[in-house]
C-alpha cells in the first residue's frame, strides 16, 4: 500500500503522523521477514505495545476532542471504538498464538492491513476535518498534550508477550499518562 499523503498543518496532525510512521516502520520490519521466532515475538510485542498505547491515548485525548468538535463526532468515535475493539481482539489472538503456528503470520498480516487502512482514513478524512474544526491553536495544544502523554508512557517492561499482554500494556500506559 502506498502511504497516504500526510497532512501536517498543526501539531496534532504532526504527532499522529509520527505515531503512524513509527507503526509503519514496525510493520515493514515484520514484513521483511524475521527468521528467529524469539525475534518475531519481540517485534510483535513492540507492535502490540505501540497499538495499545495509540488506543489508550486516543481514548483519553483525541476521542473527546472529536466528540466536542465535529457535528458527527459521536458517530465518528463510535466507529473508531468499534475498530479499536476489532484491533484489540486481533492483538489478543496474536499474543496467544505461537510464532511457529501456521496462523501467526496471517493474523499479523490481517492486523497490519486493518491498521494501515485506518491510518489512511485518518489521513484522508479525520485529521483534516478535526484540524479545521478545532482551529490551529487548539489543535496545536492537543498535539502537544498527546506528545507529552506519549513520551510519558513507559516502554514495555519485557518482551514477554503472554495471554494478558494487551491488558498489561493498557494498564502501563494508562497509569503513566493519568
Question: Which residues does each predicted region cover?
Answer:
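Small-residue-biased structural context
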Residues: 1-178
Amino acid at each position: 500500500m502506498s502511504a497516504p499523503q500526510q497532512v501536517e498543518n498543526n501539531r496534532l496532525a504532526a504527532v499522529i503522523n509520527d505515531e503512524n510512521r513509527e507503526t509503519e516502520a514496525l510493520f515493514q520490519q515484520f514484513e521483511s521477514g524475521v527468521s528467529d521466532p524469539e525475534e518475531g515475538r519481540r517485534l510483535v510485542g513492540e507492535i502490540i505495545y505501540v497499538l495499545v498505547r495509540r488506543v489508550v491515548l486516543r481514548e483519553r485525548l483525541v476521542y473527546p476532542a472529536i466528540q466536542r468538535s465535529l457535528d458527527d463526532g459521536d458517530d465518528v468515535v463510535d466507529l473508531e471504538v468499534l475498530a479499536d475493539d476489532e484491533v484489540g481482539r486481533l492483538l489478543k489472538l496474536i499474543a496467544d498464538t505461537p510464532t511457529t503456528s501456521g496462523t501467526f503470520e496471517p493474523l499479523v498480516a490481517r492486523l497490519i492491513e486493518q491498521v494501515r487502512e485506518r491510518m489512511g482514513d485518518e489521513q484522508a478524512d479525520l485529521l483534516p476535518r478535526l484540524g479545521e474544526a478545532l482551529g490551529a491553536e487548539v489543535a496545536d495544544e492537543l498535539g502537544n498534550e498527546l506528545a507529552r502523554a506519549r513520551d510519558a508512557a513507559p516502554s514495555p517492561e519485557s518482551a514477554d508477550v503472554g495471554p494478558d499482554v494487551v491488558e498489561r500494556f493498557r494498564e502501563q500506559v494508562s497509569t503513566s499518562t493519568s
